[in-house]
Amino acid sequence: MPAEIKPSAPAEPETPTKSKPKSSSSSHGKPALARVTLLDGSLLDVSIDRKAIGRDVINSICAGLNLIEKDYFGLTYETPTDPRTWLDLEKPVSKFFRTDTWPLTFAVKFYPPEPSQLKEDITRYHLCLQVRNDILEGRLPCTFVTHALLGSYLVQSEMGDYDAEEMPTRAYLKDFKIAPNQTAELEDKVMDLHKTHKGQSPAEAELHYLENAKKLAMYGVDLHPAKDSEGVDIMLGVCASGLLVYRDKLRINRFAWPKILKISYKRHHFYIKIRPGEFEQYESTIGFKLANHRAAKKLWKSCVEHHTFFRLMTPEPVSKSKMFPVFGSTYRYKGRTQAESTNTPVDRTPPKFNRTLSGARLTSRSMDALALAEKEKVARKSSTLDHRGDRNADGDAHSRSPIKNKKEKDADKEAKLREKKQKEKEEKERKEREKRELEEKKKAEKAAKAALAAGAAAGAAVNGNDELNDSNKSDKSSGRRGVGIFSSGRKSKSGSPSKDGKDKSGKDKDKEVGRLGLVVTSGLGDNQQDQNLDEAARNAAKNRGSTTPGVTRQYEYAVDNDGNTSPTRKSYTPGGFRYDQDPNSRKSGADGQEQLSPTSQQKKIGLAFNYAPGNENALKETAEKLKAGQLSPRTQDKLNRGQLSPKSRAKLLQDPLLSPTTRAKLQGSAVDAAAVPLSDSQKRSYSPTKGPQGYSSGAPGSYKPISDPTADFLESQRYNKEPGYVGPSKADVAAGLAGAAGSKKPGSPTKTGKGAPGAAAAAAAGAAGAAAAAAKPKKRRVKIMVITSKFDPSTKRIDAENGSIEHSTGILDPATGLIDTKYGVIDPKKGTLEALNTKTGKKEVFQGDVDGKTGNLHLVSGVADPKTGRLDDTLGQIVCITPQDNPVVELTVITSRIDPATGKIDTVNGDVERSLGVLNLDTGLLDTKYGEINTRTGELKAIDPKSGKIVVSKNVKVDPGTGQITILGIVDPKTNKIDPNQGRLIEVGQQIDPIVEVTSLAGKFDSKRNIIDPKTAQVETSGGQFDPKAGKIDTKYGQIDLVKHTITFNDPKSGKTVTRDIKIEPTTGQIVLKNQVNPKNNKPDKDYARIISLRIVQQRVDPATKAPITEVSASKDKDIVVDPKSNQIWVPTGATDPATKEQQYISSSVDPKTGYVITIYGYLDPKTNEIKKQTKLDPNTIKIEPTSGKIYTATGEVDQATGEPLYAATQVDPESGEVYTKLARVDPKTGKIVIVRILLISKTDERGRPEEIDPSTCEIDPVSGRVLKFFNKTVYVYNMIDPVTGEIVQVDPNDPRFAGARTTVTHTMTLTGEIDPVTGRIKSEYGDIDPNTGDIDPATAVTDPVTGKLILNYAQIDPSHFGKQAQVQTTTETVPITRQQFFDGVKHISKGALRRDSEGSSDDDMTAQYGADQVNEILIGSPAGQAGGKLGKPVSTPTVVKTTTKQVLTKNIDGVTHNVEEEVRNLGTGEVTYSTQEHKADATPTDLSGAYVTATAVTTRTATTHEDLGKNAKTEQLEEKTVATTRTHDPNKQQQRVVTQEVKTTATVTSGDQYQRRDSVSSTSSGDSGTPIDGPYDGASVVRTDNQKSPLFTTSATTGPHVESTRVVLGEDTPGFSGHGEIISTQTVSSKTRTVETITYKTERDGIVETRVEQKITIQSDGDPIDHDKALAEAIQEATAMNPDMTVEKIEIQQQTQ
């Protein structure tokens, strides 16, 4: 905060607009309060006119901060849909806020590309704060090296020079927050780099910080999520240079501002018109799709503003249309541009501003405070800045760049001499200084006490509203102003009591500390300034004697004769550091002499923020206390600094005030954060010692992301990302605070300055809570039913019977217990609802009552009319909340006799019953009316009807294939004994919503016939909600308990909640309620009764109209049929029997014994007008798979593709425990069940929706229909080995550089293992693997035993290094290489010579050896055929040859058998060739596992050759697909793997005699490693030379033009290879750019026969000069990519002439 600020009333800020007279109204006359979060995290309250525009507010803020270059800054605010929206500075601020307090955030909007061009240090200081926040919040990703470098400047700015005595280890860095996730390795690197920055002032460190930060890729980029034209998720970034496009965290395109002609948006689309290129004729328009029109407009406005600010000299004026209306947006940026800001002269003295809060920490040589007489000596010793008398006053006075300026030679020599003298006097001065410090200590203590007493009296008389422009007076202001660039924010009012300050309150001590921070270089005269510094030194000495840690250090900086105090006018080397440079070498310039700052004429002392105050012993004790767990970054920071009083500490730990997902503070049920003033302990602070926070949730009912999408996009780019790190909100520990809520309140301060023992208990509780926060429970979905009706104030009763019912879904946060719903945030414990008051426009908390009997929430205030959406005081609401922990599933039960021959239940003649069950996903238990069935162990827990005890029987069988449950032996209802010949077949259907369709029949009750009089009967349909755990159903008539046979409702007479018994009619299973309210007199009538039929439906729609149940009109109730004899209520389903055309009806029955609801189907007989119950198998609602007997039940849905009805069946996988539902349709032709979708119920998202799986990606048993492999994920990762570094890199297969190159390998991995539901990673023996990228979590990664390196990607796994080599021996044949195989790339090389990454995907899978290893020689278009074809048509018909190779590998006790069957089919001629091979090998004697392995690999290769004889061009396309399946049957386990590999290659060959044309052949030897290949010079494709002894000098007899060439020889052994070698084959393929010669030969050495492959690559050009270095690099890169195992043996560069 600058010290030179003229006092002004905050209510009258500096604005360029004229303020209108205030209204006489009190609401408009009272000034508004804008609560602004500054860049250091502190809060600033600004009083301003309500009619003020945004520019007035930012002018007031910049005036208070003493900023002149204010055009780079802006204000942001939060909306329900966007957590970071820029405030329009030309509109009134009151337009964007409805509350009295305007929450705003001060931020940098336009990032200058060159920070050194900023004119003032204070502007750079605030830019540094913004960049620091961007790094810590994840918007600016950095690498390890960048984090270390920037962190070293952070440490230099805060702590000064490195001191080996005080900083022997990296312990002094433990309080620094350098990176979002920092490690010990990073701190070591920071410590090493910190040593190299000796002598840099804080201002210099700031400029170094910015000069390195501007080089980051995401510096100043404003990201917006979008989709491209193909629907792929991308991010659009707006920056100073133009528009950037990102996809999968990589920048894939850039549109510079000069290349863009026009930007526009329409609805949710954003368009840019591109200027045509040099060879383009028309303009092109590119469109992007955004989430909504608001997002599109936000992106458009950002582009307009950035383009105007950085590219234009002045803003574009808004054109005024006179005659024609303007349909587009007239928005234009009206602020000053960068050019105007740069050209505006600054005619003031550089402001002096504080980078400190208070105190001094005298532990560094460069920061020691001495007497004023010794100030100059300390300056010489601690800084590389030279004496003022030796400066050149006019040498580059305006240079602020860290680039080293040239010095005059004479000045350099003198500087060198002075440096030598300075070193000689160093030891002597240190001893003198220590002696003086001891003498001045007592004097400083007395002076400090007197100054503090006077300051306290002055601070007590300050008005709180003066804080905006007067930082020297108010303690409130000192809590907000004056911090170092990397400080942790403002100091709270609750300071930490010191040992000798026990008689002072924390508040008084904080005032003292706040005043101490304002005595530094405040623009006074030199004498007064020296006095202030002397007083600061004495106060520092006083602090040195106490145990209160000082929070500042002194530093020196240069002041010129004009009073310019900019500390950045020192020249230094760019970049700031070098790894190979001596740390002491920074004292010298380029020629070894000391650097000089030409503008510095005088040394001054300032105060810099000390980031790790206090003695080391106290810090170590604090670290030991917090070792068991970690509090939130805010709490831990203040505890380490001792800045929390015991009272504040107890309040913070006892109240879970911080929401884990929002920045806002929750009080009770989330009181509006804007309406409640925040205390100091709740104010946000972005700092290096504070973790990032998420964004606050907005208005109720809007489900928006809890974090910034920009942060989500950049999250994975963070250095050393933690395992399972899901976003910034993870740093918060609300659970930890909640865990500490029960701790005792710490007592008053003791003599030692510590709290009562309760503080230790609170810290321990917070640590335990932090551990609980690490395992944060997942949010769960709950069902909500709301009954809205009239509220009677006299009886305080809500008329629920005549109310409207609405069903919805809410999200329960287990950490807070709050439920986020469309109505607002509900606290079920306190009975409150936080919702938006439509009358006041504010969020308010409405108090309700929680019914102790039903648990429902009754609200009589804050209730909105469902029709209008406005609050209505005459309405009341009953909110019923039901958890959805386990899914409710339909059960189809067939009870019949057991066939003694097959042991199966007769499903055709059995009785069918439809009921419900609750399936526990974790244990596999199925709760049914027949008992609790364990689907894994086959146990049945049921209640014995005689004894009433739980009996466990094992007469349950679960079919592992179909998942059907069979109960053998059931109780005969007649004899009440178990009949072993009877059984039940239970089939689990689909998961349904616990929504109840309540159909009631009310009227005069006939007690004799036990029915309702048909004349007075009235039918009504409504909704209900079913709680399967409690067995209760909430309806508008009350809460029905099906187990206890009771109903709980609100008595209309007394208005109290009462519980009455209900009667369940045994014949119909319907509920009979007597003594109901008669609608005629609106009073209870003993003769008036109501019969209720409950049906739990799978959809909340009417079967005929598909309308929601709550909207079914009374006219639809006429279709309901009531049985006149039994009053059974039948509801039409809308379906008919296709054979008899009878209408289908449905009813329900409640089992009186178990309370389970049973669904009954029936058909209406048109003759008798009666409904017949369907007790047998109904083919319209149930389908049976003929092969497996699996039962599928109708869902009521239809297939979107075919329109046929869908049937469902649910199954529990016996091995993995996964629960999945198969949705299928019946093929009308074959009658077979065809699976359409698979829903994985056991894997749900945050809202409870099951994961949907495509059946085509699953392996389904054709017999039983069981999904054998459905949760394994097949991932396509494209990798290649970097020929320079040897590392595996991932490439984009669509990149033109790789699409046609032979170096591209499509690597398919099969990752098998349990999927972590939180992180989504697959757990394997090599670590937790990300299925999307193949990256392995570093925390669980293993080390390669051979290389010793950590395996961080699945492709880096070499199974042979882990002893997993295949125990198979086969006979191999060496086949001469062909031209076709050369086009195929590296596939022709044996596995011994080349190990592709695809082997790593199937480590112990034997198909890796046989998947695509069998390559057959296919000669397409021989040279003779080509020569003869020249006389025919210019263009020939394409030749297509399809080769199918099937390999079956069987390993058993007898050994290994390998069968190969091959079919070569010429699709043009119809010629088919078959061939078979068989290889056998004996079993390995060491293999005693007894495993039986069957591996099948089917490879399909389609080669298409298109020959253009007129152009002598041939285009060959090769597509290959290999599907390898391995099944391992082991006594202990069964495993199956499937590997699919696809390779596509396209090559264009120009053959014939083109080599004879010499006139227009271009030299294209670079940039196209796989581009056009010409034919050999003699017309032959393959040249073979036999029986040559020296393979290194084998040449081919080709003739061609004499060229300048570079030859690269690749081989596996040394150049001096000795031995007898026999040439097997040679091949030479030439083009106009290169010649590749491949030699295959075998040699015998020491009785061992080896096969070697050697390649010679010659780079050539047709007579043109060649770039040897470039050509050589390309040759090595291509050859190494083709065969990574080969090495370069010899490089020859020759000059050949004709």
UniProtKB/Swiss-Prot annotation:
It is found in: Cell junction, Septate junction. Residues 317-434 are annotated as: Hydrophilic. Its main location: other. Residues 562-571, 594-603, 684-696, 1533-1554, 1584-1599 have a biased composition (Polar residues). SMART domains: B41, FA, FERM_C. Residues 32-314 form the FERM domain. Residues 1-31, 335-361, 374-710, 1509-1599 are annotated as: Disordered. InterPro entries: Band_4.1_C, Band_41_domain, FA, FERM/acyl-CoA-bd_prot_sf, FERM_2, FERM_central, FERM_CS, FERM_domain. GO terms for cellular component: cytoskeleton; plasma membrane; septate junction; smooth septate junction. Residues 374-448, 499-514, 579-589, 618-627, 1509-1532 have a biased composition (Basic and acidic residues). GO terms for molecular function: actin binding; structural molecule activity. Gene3D superfamilies: 1.20.80.10, Phosphatidylinositol 3-kinase Catalytic Subunit, Chain A, domain 1 (3.10.20.90), Pleckstrin-homology domain (PH domain)/Phosphotyrosine-binding domain (PTB) (2.30.29.30). SUPFAM superfamilies: PH domain-like, Second domain of FERM, Ubiquitin-like. PANTHER family: 4.1 G PROTEIN, PROTEIN 4.1 HOMOLOG. This is Protein 4.1 homolog.
